[in-house]
């Protein structure tokens, strides 16, 4: 079927999203004399209940993951069917902008409050995607601009939440005098995989249900434009709310 023909490209994008954090320089966390807690679920539940920063960060990161997952999974379909060109060059521009923007975003995170910088780029990503729904065949330069700006915002989504999380880990371990880093990173990894799985499992069947299913000769483009151009904006709105509620450590 048509969707299976692009599975290799989708796997490539998914792999890049999951492997990118490996390329980001790890932030050192102090290692005081801490006690290891035996109960994983109890520790995580207790952290969610007592640390509002951790809860807000996880919720914001989940919605950001869903938004980025949908745009990444539908990227090739959108470029081929709406813009009408090969997606390779736009993929290079998109991910290239993300990587090139990392040093700039890292510097901004050091100079200003990381939470405020992240919220700014979440809002910028929403503004950048507003024209996407209205793009049509041949709008290559307009979509190239979207790729550059949204790729830059993707860099912020990759580096700033991880940096904020490192601060939360350090603060929580000092407050509770127990080892929490492994548990928190496990939750973080689960959120990454869950958001990507939900994006793939929901958006592709949804656009097929509403009329875009090339394997059955259905080429209604409105569902594809809505899913790629509008849904990521909607999903980022709760992320703005939760990220705005993060308090500076």
Which functions belong to the PLM regions below?
Residues 1-249:
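Membrane-embedded alpha-helical bundles of multi-pass transporters/translocases
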């Amino acid at each position: 079927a048509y969707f299976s023909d692009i599975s290799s490209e989708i796997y490539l994008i998914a792999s890049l999203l999951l492997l990118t954090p490996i390329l980001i320089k790890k932030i050192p966390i102090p290692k005081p004399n801490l006690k290891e807690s035996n109960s994983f679920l109890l520790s995580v539940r207790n952290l969610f209940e007592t640390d509002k920063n951790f809860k807000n960060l996880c919720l914001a990161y989940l919605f950001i993951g869903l938004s980025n997952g949908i745009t990444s999974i539908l990227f090739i379909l959108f470029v081929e069917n709406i813009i009408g060109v090969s997606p390779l060059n736009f993929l290079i521009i998109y991910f290239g902008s993300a990587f090139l923007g990392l040093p700039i975003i890292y510097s901004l995170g050091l100079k200003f409050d990381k939470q405020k910088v992240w919220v700014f780029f979440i809002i910028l990503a929403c503004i950048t995607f507003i024209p996407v729904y209205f793009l049509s065949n041949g709008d290559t330069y307009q979509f190239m601009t979207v790729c550059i700006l949204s790729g830059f915002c993707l860099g912020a989504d990759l580096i700033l939440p991880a940096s904020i999380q490192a601060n939360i880990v350090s603060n929580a371990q000092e407050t509770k005098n127990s080892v929490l880093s492994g548990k928190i990173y496990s939750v973080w990894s689960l959120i990454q995989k869950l958001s990507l799985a939900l994006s793939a499992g929901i958006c592709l069947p949804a656009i097929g249900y509403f009329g875009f299913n090339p394997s059955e000769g259905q080429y209604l483009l409105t569902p594809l434009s809505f899913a790629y151009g509008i849904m990521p904006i909607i999903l980022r709105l709760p992320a703005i709310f939760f990220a705005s509620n993060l308090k500076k450590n």
